[in-house]
Amino acid sequence: MNNTLKVEIWSDVICPFCYIGKRKFESALKQFEANDNIEITWKSFQLAPDLKTDTSISIDEYLAIHKGFSIEKTREMNTYVTQIAKQEGLSFNFDRSIVANTLLAHQMLHFARTVGKQEVTKERLLKAYFTDGKNIDDKQTLIELATEIGLDIDKLNQALNSNDFVDEVKADIDEAQQLGVRGVPFFVFNRSHAISGAQPVEVFVETIQQVLKQTQEEIILSDDQVCDIDGNCD
């Protein structure tokens, strides 16, 4: 890659297709000889900003209650998503996932960005939620994850307790609305091309090639597997 590629990704930590889409995007990047000229910024998006964290019910039960599905239907849906994730080398354990608000996690991501560790933090938060069954709305849990990553615990604690990055989280969400984002993941390349959803790897490859060649100026939008603002993932 001779040109700098700036990628902004709107994503939520409890969005399964955001994790799947991350892997597909990463697979696409591997097909280029050099990717050190890539600047990736993870933007905040909350599928359920008013969600109340509840450790007493399962994800299946939550979806059944709030989406009007049967338990059998929600299990079927989550099994389907788990199979898709497995194809990308991911292990989803929805039976362990905790119903949790993601505001604290997004604040942590913004803090991590200030010290150049946003990428590793994003990966750890996604794994914590989908694989490890961690409560990502619990400050102590986030501190433990931060210790693994190597973040400054005292500074992170201060940031979380003082809500230092709430405005940044809200600004990301407002920006997404201005761009017309209706679901995540949503990838924007050099502010000229966009991909919505966990698209096939070849779609990411083709888009990156187009951006680097600067063949077009308008946004090209591809739409596939997404979690929308109503919390529906398909």
Language-model-detected regions and their locations in the chain:
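C-terminal cap of thioredoxin/glutaredoxin-like
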Residues: 2-3, 7-11, 17-34, 110-234
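Short, N-terminal intrinsically disordered low-complexity segments that are rich in Pro/Gly
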Residues: 11-14, 18, 49, 70-71
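Structural alpha/beta surface segment adjacent to cysteine/selenocysteine redox centers
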Residues: 23-129, 232-233
